[in-house]
Regions:
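Short beta->alpha connector loops at strand-helix junctions that form conserved
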Residues: 72-73, 113, 139-140, 162, ...
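Active-site regions of enzymes building and remodeling cell-envelope glycoconjugates
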Residues: 63-74, 107, 200-203, 222-225
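Structured adenosyl-cofactor binding patch, chiefly the S-adenosyl-L-methionine
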Residues: 91, 130-131, 145-158, 215-251
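RNA substrate-binding interface of SAM-dependent RNA methyltransferases
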Residues: 44, 97, 102-189
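Active-site/ligand-binding-proximal alpha/beta "capping" segment
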Residues: 183-233, 237
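Glycine/small-residue-rich loop that forms an oxyanion/phosphate-binding "nest" at active or ligand-binding sites
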Residues: 67-94
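Short acidic-hydrophobic, aromatic-tinged amphipathic segments that line or gate anion-handling sites
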Residues: 3-6, 70-73, 161-169
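Boundary-proximal intrinsically disordered activation/regulatory segments immediately upstream
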Residues: 1-57, 142-143
Length: 251
């Protein structure tokens, strides 16, 4: 295993940039994850690892050939970790091909419209994985699904679930071509209860907590749906609302 003791080493600088910049992640074609448990998930699901950095004293797992393995002292790990308290392991993963498919052949898709909190996006991806959602689309400046915070919140779902980033027009053209209706979680004259919606084959859009669905996405929804809840409550957290919708599509 390679040993690095300098914070100014080129790899350490590269890792800090992966942590800080979405544009840098895209340009370099890889993203950063942290934690021993997440590394175990990445190995379990054959994620395309590029580099693994471990703190001194952390046992190295069996790594695929071609993966660069590095050990660093505690002070260097603190300088590159996205966590205030480092978890002992950092690793980089090759970004997946996120080009839109020619056709959607699945039955259930989720659309996130302007959901900007990384923790919410990560939790939603984790829930989408649990309920066998066929794909998640991110439109209108959602949080980066490949930031360290988002990836951590997915608990490994980022390694095995399709996530597409596209414009609203690209999304709607693909849904139309695939003969998939788009429903929006919002109130409108045509709003129906989630329990009564026909979700056997559909895409459902969830908006941000502060603004809800954008006018752009709302105008493209064939119908809108609402989650039945106590009149005392006005709305749900975006991740909670997505979880309820995903469960309803799954069951």
């Amino acid at each position: 295993m390679e040993h690095i003791t300098s914070r100014q080493n080129a790899l350490m600088t590269h890792i800090r940039k992966l942590n800080a910049s979405r544009a840098y992640r895209r340009a370099s074609g890889e993203y950063l994850c942290d934690g021993v448990k997440l590394l175990e998930e990445a190995l379990r699901w054959n994620a395309p690892l590029k580099t693994v950095v471990l703190s001194e004293g952390v046992d190295a797992p069996a790594l695929p050939s071609g993966v660069r393995a590095v050990q660093v002292p505690a002070d260097v790990m603190r300088s590159i970790s996205p966590m205030e308290t480092p978890q002992g392991a950092l690793f980089t993963v090759r970004l997946p091909d996120t080009a839109l498919p020619e056709m959607l052949t699945g039955a259930h898709y989720l659309v996130l419209d302007g959901v900007q909190d990384p923790g919410n996006v990560g939790t939603i991806l984790r829930t989408a994985d649990a309920f066998d959602c066929d794909g998640v689309f991110l439109v209108n400046a959602c949080a980066d699904p490949y930031s360290p915070k988002t990836a951590r919140a997915t608990m490994g779902a980022v390694f095995r679930r399709d996530v597409y980033q596209c414009t609203a027009d690209e999304l709607c053209a693909l849904l139309q071509k695939s003969n998939l209706p788009l429903y929006g979680a919002a109130l409108r004259n045509d709003t129906v209860s989630l329990r009564d919606a026909e979700l056997s084959r559909a895409a459902v859009a969830i908006g941000s907590e502060g603004r809800g669905l954008s006018a752009e996405i709302l105008s493209k929804c064939e119908k809108t749906i609402k989650i039945p809840m106590s009149p005392r409550c006005e709305s749900l957290n975006a991740a909670v609302a997505a979880s309820v919708v995903l469960w309803e599509m799954y069951r």
